[in-house]
């Protein structure tokens, strides 16, 4: 299956935010191109019972080695919020501005990992952008598709964008811009 990518951004942005989103486009396009190059390895790693760390290791080759993302970085804590958010990958755009990348697999939708990642990015003062890497399909033991996380993630994440009312609530900075690119699935 092809490696697809979908982007969501706030409906209203100023010029600085637009420029930052353009920089995210370039990062995301590079990530997608590199994942396409690794499609065979991704398909071999994305099998029944595999851990998300198998896919994460492949994505890490691109994010850490080529794009200079940090791995498992603890984000700046905020007053009143009890969390030690530690995304899979983080890239600092400038002081206090960044993008985090999360790789999900089996629990993407069933365990709400996609929404947890949105929440983590939303409450993190250092993060304004989120790349989600999710599978097209997860498989049963006999090789059939058990679920299709990618289209469900697109629908769920897309619900947070499209109108200023749905995008409101964050006091500073642009709302999240989500890249949901997924590993191609096997089968």
Go through the PLM ranges and name each one.
Residues 1-77:
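Interdomain/boundary linker segments immediately adjacent to catalytic/signaling cores
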Residues 45-49, 57-95, 108-116, 123:
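Active-site metal-binding core of divalent-cation-utilizing nuclease and nuclease-like domains
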Residues 136-187:
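Domain-level recognition of nuclease-like catalytic cores that cleave nucleotide substrates
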Residues 100-103, 107-117, 142:
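Active-site-adjacent loop/helix micro-motif of nuclease/hydrolase catalytic cores
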Residues 130-136:
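Acidic beta-strand-to-loop metal/phosphate-binding motif
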Residues 121-123, 165:
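N-terminal cationic-hydrophobic initiation segments that often serve targeting/anchoring roles
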Residues 51-55, 113, 149-156:
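Soluble or luminal CAZymes and related metallo-dependent hydrolases
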């Amino acid at each position: 299956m092809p490696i697809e990518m979908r982007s969501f951004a706030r409906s209203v942005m100023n010029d600085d935010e637009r420029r930052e989103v353009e920089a995210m486009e370039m990062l995301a396009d590079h990530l997608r191109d590199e994942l396409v190059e690794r499609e065979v390895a991704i398909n071999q790693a994305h099998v029944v019972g595999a851990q998300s760390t198998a896919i994460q290791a492949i994505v890490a080759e691109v994010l850490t080695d080529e794009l200079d993302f940090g791995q498992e970085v603890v984000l700046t804590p905020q007053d009143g919020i009890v969390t030690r958010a530690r995304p899979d990958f983080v890239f600092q755009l400038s002081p206090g501005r960044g993008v985090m990348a999360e790789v999900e697999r089996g629990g993407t939708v069933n365990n709400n990992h996609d929404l947890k990642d949105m929440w983590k990015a939303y409450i993190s003062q250092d993060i304004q952008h989120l790349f989600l890497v999710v599978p097209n399909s997860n498989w049963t033991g006999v090789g059939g598709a058990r679920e299709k996380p990618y289209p469900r993630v697109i629908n769920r994440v897309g619900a947070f964008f499209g109108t200023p009312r749905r995008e409101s609530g964050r006091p500073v900075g642009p709302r999240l811009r989500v890249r949901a690119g997924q590993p191609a699935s096997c089968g």
